[in-house]
């Protein structure tokens, strides 16, 4: 990230939704989405509003700028480290990519973030715990019901020792409605994980 761009990166500040972490226009506990929907994860926080970092995220995901993961992961540790410390996770788990997309892109952007975050906070990272076994459609143009159907049976537990973990931090690049994080959180809890928290690089605004 060039020095000229650094001042443009403005982290999400209070008030934010106490469940998903989206920036709120006014002081209250929850955004409109979280007031009407029960999430499977326990709590989430995000680093930036998507509109402020959209070009950087595009380059990170689609232009081979894998090194962005180091910078943004370290910023996650710096700005969200207090939250992560309070929830006391056993491990950091990145949201997995489908193997075909991983081959095409060459890297999983969520895993890049998770590795840098783990290094900075001295927390272990488990990239094999959750596997994506279906190539799902892009989520941005789907309604909530279509998002849920799109992700059904898309993830499996990739190891048989998930019960070693009690509290997990999921890491992803973008939070829109939380459907992906909910799907993985529900799967993890079915296998004995008690708490699933989430941190993301960016999200939309709450209403």
Segments (PLM) and residue ranges:
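Glycine-rich phosphate/pyrophosphate-handling loop used in enzymes and phosphotransfer proteins
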Residues: 1-207
């Amino acid at each position: 990230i060039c020095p000229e761009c650094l001042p443009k990166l403005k982290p999400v500040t209070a008030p934010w939704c106490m469940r998903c972490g989206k920036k709120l226009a006014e002081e209250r506990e929850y955004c409109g989405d979280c007031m009407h929907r029960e999430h499977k994860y326990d709590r989430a926080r995000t680093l930036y509003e998507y509109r402020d970092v959209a070009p950087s995220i595009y380059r990170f995901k689609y232009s081979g700028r894998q090194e962005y993961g180091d910078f943004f992961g370290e910023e996650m540790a710096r700005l969200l480290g207090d939250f992560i410390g309070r929830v006391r996770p056993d491990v950091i788990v990145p949201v997995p990519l489908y193997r075909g997309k991983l081959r095409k892109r060459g890297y999983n952007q969520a895993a890049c973030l998770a590795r840098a975050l783990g290094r900075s906070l001295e927390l272990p990272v488990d990239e094999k715990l959750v596997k994506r076994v279906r190539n799902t459609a892009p989520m941005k143009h789907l309604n909530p019901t279509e998002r849920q159907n799109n992700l059904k049976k898309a993830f499996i537990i990739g190891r048989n020792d998930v019960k070693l973990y009690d509290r997990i931090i999921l890491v992803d690049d973008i939070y829109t409605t939380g459907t992906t994080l909910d799907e993985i959180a529900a799967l993890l809890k079915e296998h004995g994980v008690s708490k699933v928290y989430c941190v993301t690089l960016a999200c939309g605004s709450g209403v």
